[in-house]
Every structure is written in structure tokens, then in C-alpha cells.
Amino acid sequence: MLKSRSLGLAAIAGTLLLTGILAAQTSSPRDTWQFTVSGDSRNCGDVVMPAIAADIMSHHPAFYWHLGDFRATYTFDEDYTHQPEHAGRTLSISEYLGTEWQDFLDNQIAPFGTLPVFLGIGNHETIPPRTREEYIAEFAEWLDAPAIRAQRHRDNPRDFRLRTYYHWRERNVDFINLDNSTLDQFDAEQMLWFERLLERDQADGSVATIVVGMHEALPDSIANDHSMSESLPGLFSGRRAYQDLLYAVIHGHKLVYVLASHSHFYMENIFNTDYLSQHGGVLPGWIIGTAGAVRYDLPSKATRGPGARTNVYGYLLATVNADGTIHFEFRNLEETSVPAAIAARYKPEFVHWCWDQNSQAPKQP
């Protein structure tokens, strides 16, 4: 484990605020570029994800990153049962399991066209009978995408193994996709890989920023009850990963941003808790589980407002400045955002159901 030392909340917040101000003063639109992120697209993802793709294309981002939970797996997704070819039929679970991942690719990933898409693994991708090994086989094309394969071979020319965790470089930013889809993660092998990567990044002057994405949020966030804290291996390894990232900020002088989904709402500044402010500092963090899954109520400790919203669908639009600072904006999508062809295929009544009824959270006045 990398050695970590304490850094107060005010120091980290002040540093990030200062760098954000400087970026706004010194970066021109020509110096910036964008990427997009969201996760959790079961239930209504076949309707919501095409809307996300259509909105994303207007920004011309470098890529889209899905943080996991493509399909429900344990039961039929509502969008699956409302497809015309399934209407009025009694579906079998074997038929569903045999087609659910292809359904995801056909209806949720195909709308992105030639835009690079990076896939993270969620807990629903490992619900029995699904396994991590089956996931690797099914999504090998994405896990061995050109950017990932090139980076893996730069790290080790003899490494041809596909993994559910990986990283790739875009300009001066290192993007790290971690796997915490099962309760035993992060295991020793993944932690060793992660910490060695952070060590290399800290020694590399060409890396200004580290963006870490995963399905479940690291422990001790505002959304702690639905995070890596749900298992002891997750709690211990997640806290260790958090301290490793703090070390990269304090001693490596890197900018660090942490992204997760799993909770089906939008929330920013998720690590602004008493525990973390007293145990090293608060990293910038977001939850963006808003790509179609049944919406959850916000945690009791969350302050409702622009930075914490439920009963919404959308994605994060990230704008990267030349110095590596990143501005994240939540792009909220309305029912009218659904492409006409998708609304016609699923019928307006079901599209409205997705926006109005696909929720376990109370409606706000």
C-alpha cells in the first residue's frame, strides 16, 4: 500500500478551487475536450440510453463510459418485455438470459455509432448464473478496445490478458476503470495492479489528472449504505484505495476525480463526510446511476438540490481543461429527449411510464 498522510478538507478544497479558477482564466475553448459518463441502465435503459446517446453526440465527446449494470438479470427488464417482438408472449427466463446482453449491445450501445464506448462491470453482471469470466468473453471486444490494448502493451508488452479492470490515457489524463462488482473486491491482485499504476502516474510528469471510475462508490461517502461498505473486504480495500488516491493528490501533486454509479440517482461531492474530512481529506466524487434503472430515494444525509437529485435520467458531461482540471455538469434528460423512432417502437405510454413510474423514490412537490 502506498504510504498516506493526513491532509485537511480545507487544503484539498482550496487547492481544487484555486486550480479551477486558474483554468477558467487561462483555458480557451480550443484547449478543452470532453467525455461523458453514466451507469445503471437496466429496467428502462433501452429507452433512456438512446436519448443519452443522441444528446451526447451534440457535444462531440472523446468517448462515453458506462459504469455497469446493463440489464437486471434476476428478472425481466421492463423495456425488454415491452419490445414489439415480445408483446403478448410468455417469456422464459432462459430466453431472456440468452439474449439480455445482446439486447444491451443492440439497443443501448449501437446508438453511439463510432464513438468509443468503455464498459465497466456492475454487480448485476455477476448475478448468478452470470460470472466474471462470462462477462469477459461476452464483452471482449470492448475490454480489448484499441486504447485499452495499446495501453496494456505499453505497460507490459507481454500482457495479453483481458481483465474487467483496466486503464487508458487520453492526453494528460489517466482513466482507471476498477471492478468492485462482487463483495470480495478489490482483491489483492487488483489492488497490486492499482497501486503500481498510481506509483507510475505519480512519477510521470505527463500525467496531470487521474480519473477513477467504478460501479459501487468507495466507502464512507454520503451514500455509504449502498457502497463498498456492504462487505468487510470491500470496506477495507475501498478505504485503502481512497487513501492511495489521497496520497496521489498530496505527494504526487495529481488532480484526482472519482466516479461511481450503483445508486440510482445523481449526487456530487459524495465524499464530503465527517469521517473522510477527519481521515485524510475529501476527494471530488460523483454518483451517476441515472441511465435507465429504477430510481432510488436519496440518502437521508443528502441535501436535496442541484447537486443531489433523484427521479432523473441523464449523464455527466466532463470538460477537461489544458491543465487537467475537469468541470463536471449533469445533463438532465426529459421524456421529450427520447428519439422519435424509439418512442414509436416502445409506444409513448411506456416511455411515459419510464419517466413517471420507474421509481422507488417519493415524488417531490
Predicted regions and their residues:
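N-terminal active-site segment of His-dependent metallophosphoesterases
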Residues: 24-95
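Residue-level marker for buried hydrophobic side chains located in beta-strands
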Residues: 35-37, 64-66, 119-120, 212, ...
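Active-site glycine-centered loops adjacent to acidic/histidine catalytic or metal-binding residues
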Residues: 40, 68-69, 122-123, 215, ...
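Active-site His/acidic residue clusters
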Residues: 216-234
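A short C-terminal boundary segment appended to hydrolase-like catalytic domains
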Residues: 304-365
